[in-house]
């Protein structure tokens, strides 16, 4: 992997779903939406001074949202929602944002 570059897309794991679940409330607050369905589909990572997770979320009704979550290197499992893109489709590629 190239430092700073994005990995190839991989199917979401239980760990990635847990990361997404931990920032769901923050995303709902920022988008003023309530997500009945919030399922991680796939993800990419980027190594920086921690790890950025770019996660494609199925939010129901054929709609998808891309979220970016930063996990620091403190070992305390601190997570921060640092970006999101709404109105995505299942076929939209995860890209840097």
Swiss-Prot record:
InterPro entries assigned: Cystatin_dom, Cystatin_sf, Prot_inh_cystat_CS, Prot_inh_stefin
GO molecular function, one term: cysteine-type endopeptidase inhibitor activity
Gene3D superfamilies: 3.10.450.10
Gene Ontology CC terms, in alphabetical order: cytoplasm; peptidase inhibitor complex
Keywords: Acetylation, Cytoplasm, Protease inhibitor, Thiol protease inhibitor
N-acetylmethionine: residues bearing it: 1
Compartment list: Cytoplasm
Segments carrying motif Secondary area of contact: 46-50
Primary localization class, coarse: cytoplasm
Coiled-coil segments: none
Site for Reactive site, residues: 4
Family from the record: Belongs to the cystatin family.
Role played: This is an intracellular thiol proteinase inhibitor.
UniProt protein name: Cystatin-A
